[in-house]
Amino acid sequence: MSSIGTGYDLGLFFSPDGRLFQAEYAYKAVENASTCIGIKCEDGVILALEKVVTSKLLKPRVNNRIGSVDRHIGIATTGFIPDGQHIVKRARDEATSWRDNYGSPIPGTVIADRLGNYVQLFTCYSSVRPFGVMSFVATYDSEGPHLYMVEPNGVYWGYNGAAAGKGRQVARNELEKLNFSSLKMKDAVKEAARILYATHDEENNKEHEIEMTWVGVETNGIHTPVPDELLQEAEAYARRIADGEEEDIAMQE
Amino acid sequence: TTITALRYKDGVILAADSRTTMGAYIANRVTDKLTQLTDNIWCCRSGSAADTQTVADLLKYYLSMYRIQFGHDPSVHTAATLASEMCYQNKNMLSAGLIVAGYDEKTGGDVYSIPLGGSLHKQPLAIGGSGSAFIYGFCDANFRENMTQEEAVEFLKNAVALAMERDGSSGGTIRMVILNKDGMERKFFAIDTANPIPVFTH
């Protein structure tokens, strides 16, 4: 980063070697945020993220970071929480405007495209800063399930499995092992919990909470939180696997 | 004006008279009030010619943009919602009564009526324009769902002909568009031709 300190990172303009530093810094903001993953399976999509419980005074299970945008759309964000809330609000506006104009639910590809374009605008003007969030867009419509991840510079790709935040590398390695074309939603919930547990920092034993939502055949196409019972079952499974792996490592020694 | 559209066994049929007036003067006696919006969606126009032509042109444009942007044809429901939204948002400036009808493989044939205020009504049979007031009784008595194409054409031809005889603002010829899985077919009826307009009064 030779151009750092020469002023090219103080606004949204190109450095002589063709980089947008403010946009790159936005990625840095997300790199240290809590892990968030999305899994697109055969019959639906799962969104899952891990929240560090920063205070015992916080009420569990109410401070949500995955929002419903329409009946069939959920968006999970990781990074700057207020930025994420803004993205969700914007997505809701897009979804209702589509419904007003066309009388039908907004397709997954369209909501991802609209959000990508919106986020990109914030890399163009000196009066604003880019969004410090990765947004996971999960939808289930007449075309089937969709999962998109919108990056801070406005780029968005469609994924079978996506991960962002602190544990993204471990999570991506685990996601690559899944067979997405045959995976069912209920099994994907377990996998999502397992993957989030696998990303856990060993030394850092802070309290964690998992937030998970899904949309697909299992939910009649409606984006909704994974039921408590199923989530607890999945977390128990994840804990068993995590403990088992630890034993394996111990035996190898 | 008299405009009508109905759902029949295999799709939809739209029909209209062809009279355009400026006060008592017939400005055009062979007007085409059936306007194509997409490959498989058409609309019947009634009210101000200028207003309805403009709304239809805009609809045509938005629907073609929809296809380009989103990679699939808009559904009949989408076209009708868009039309009703335009009529509703501009209700103070417009004098436009539309009937949007079309056929697509997914939902089959659909007919939507969009009267003056911009409301949206999905109907098996829709009639509109000044002439429609004279044929409510005829339609109530004779319309059936799931008619064959021949039955439906005959029904609409008679309905529009009856309205044309009693309504001073309707007349000229009868135009039709038939939409089904085979695509589009147009029909034309006029006096002293091989396809005459039925006569009821004596």
From Swiss-Prot, chain A:
Places the protein is found: Cytoplasm; Nucleus
In-chain residues carrying the UniProt-annotated modification Phosphoserine: S104
GO BP terms in the entry: proteasome-mediated ubiquitin-dependent protein catabolic process
Domain of life: Eukaryota
InterPro entries: Ntn_hydrolases_N (IPR029055), Proteasome_alpha (IPR050115), Proteasome_alpha-type (IPR023332), Proteasome_asu_N (IPR000426), Proteasome_sua/b (IPR001353)
Keyword Cytoplasm: yes
GO CC terms of this entry: cytosol; nucleus; proteasome core complex, alpha-subunit complex
Keywords noted in UniProt: Cytoplasm, Nucleus, Phosphoprotein, Proteasome
Family: Belongs to the peptidase T1A family.
Task of the protein: The proteasome is a multicatalytic proteinase complex which is characterized by its ability to cleave peptides with Arg, Phe, Tyr, Leu, and Glu adjacent to the leaving group at neutral or slightly basic pH. The proteasome has an ATP-dependent proteolytic activity.
PANTHER family cross-referenced by the UniProt entry: PROTEASOME SUBUNIT ALPHA/BETA (PTHR11599)
Subunit description: The 26S proteasome consists of a 20S proteasome core and two 19S regulatory subunits. The 20S proteasome core is composed of 28 subunits that are arranged in four stacked rings, resulting in a barrel-shaped structure. The two end rings are each formed by seven alpha subunits, and the two central rings are each formed by seven beta subunits. The catalytic chamber with the active sites is on the inside of the barrel.
Protein name: Probable proteasome subunit alpha type-7
Organism whose genome encodes this protein: Schizosaccharomyces pombe (strain 972 / ATCC 24843)
Gene: pre10
